[in-house]
Amino acid sequence: MVEKRNIFLIGPMGAGKSTIGRQISQQLSMEFFDSDQEIEKRTGADISWVLDLEGENKFRIREEKIINEITEKQGIVLATGGGSIQSRKTRNRLSARGLVVYLETTIDKQLDRTKRDKKKPILQNKNSVKSFLEKLATERNPLYEDIADLIIKTDFKSAKIIAHQIINTLFKT
């Protein structure tokens, strides 16, 4: 029997956190949470609207509180927002409360996976998207790497295969 420790998925938008998180939760019969969806559920608004209305700083404070609340639960899988790791408190909580898996992907794969995403307004301006994602990668990748218990490249595998790989690696017997 697999010990049901919390599993926290981190990484940039388009890495597959939500899709892979659902796969893991189904395979291990664990409850799944997506911090972006939780924000939408609690505010009754799209994540992009909340971010635009509140601004980045207030949004990150809201996100930090929600992630803190979710990570106090046991036996869960959590897909975090790509920028959630910018909060030192959030990084510390994730590290202390579960297994942290960094889903790594290339900028080109992010562009491919997010090109039809209407919830992310920055992605609609095609001229600046690649440079924006490169800037985020430069800022965030070291933070992802710093707290990761496991790093998985997601570019050339299905969500189901990646979920199996994560489960097999984290819960080797």
From Swiss-Prot:
One of its GO terms (molecular function) is magnesium ion binding. PROSITE patterns: SHIKIMATE_KINASE (PS01128). Binds 1 Mg(2+) ion per subunit. It comes from the Bacteria. Its main location: cytoplasm. GO terms for cellular component: cytosol. Its EC number is 2.7.1.71. This is Shikimate kinase. The gene is aroK.
